């Protein structure tokens, strides 16, 4: 037996050089042995360690290590539970067929990155689905001519009726002047009513009956014993009361009709009578010259400085005796 010296190796140095090199650098697929990783955030995940001896594993252990390696790569691809040998082999054959030996090419957080990317894709699809109803709404919105900015019916009739004091029938440009010019005449026409349908001899009786509706300001009778007359009330409310007697029977045997007066000659009677009077009147006199403001203010300032004489102020006498007294006493 050879004696043993301190510092000398037991075996020859050349036979044990492979103990100091990782097996995956030498291309040896049998040096991978799995063991549990207690620091892994996921359950059922195995870590990879490399054996120091190329021949220290049995064939059964090699098969088990290969299955564990495939299970590891399948779990990193998205599996969260324990996977069998058949399912892990299928997943490994689809994704990691070219990484049977060597160190792992995926980190511990690669699966977390894949999971974080997947909800973003789902959210992107959800946004596309949400945008599609908006696009259909916009298309239906632009198909309506009343809302399109360049369409002929650019102003909606309902909005015009709500926002415009002229009503929905008045156009924004053309109908404005007509409505303004006829505004005063329409107000006068609200006070006038037309009463018709009565016999010519019952005109006074019908007029007496309509006095209960309000104060009658003016009456225009029909020519040649006609069966109508125009009555003007002092207010719109009184004329509305008279309109309630339309198609009503008066005095038991006379049915009358009442409506708004549409005869422009009657409605504009006051305006027509007032226009000639204005034309016949005196011509306008030429305006007088405007006094300068500076002169007027100067005169007012001088009046304040003038002292008005008062009667009660004593005056010095200028008689002969007064002059003699001044010479004697030196006053």
UniProtKB/Swiss-Prot annotation:
Residues 1-63, 79-110 are annotated as: Disordered. Keywords: mRNA transport, Nuclear pore complex, Nucleus, Protein transport, Translocation, Transport. Its main location: nucleus. SUPFAM superfamilies: RNA-binding domain, RBD. GO terms for molecular function: nucleic acid binding; phospholipid binding; structural constituent of nuclear pore. One of its GO terms (cellular component) is nuclear pore central transport channel. It is found in: Nucleus, Nuclear pore complex. Gene3D superfamilies: 3.30.70.330. The keyword Glycosyltransferase does not apply. Interacts with Nup154. Belongs to the Nup35 family. This is Nucleoporin Nup35. The gene is Nup35.
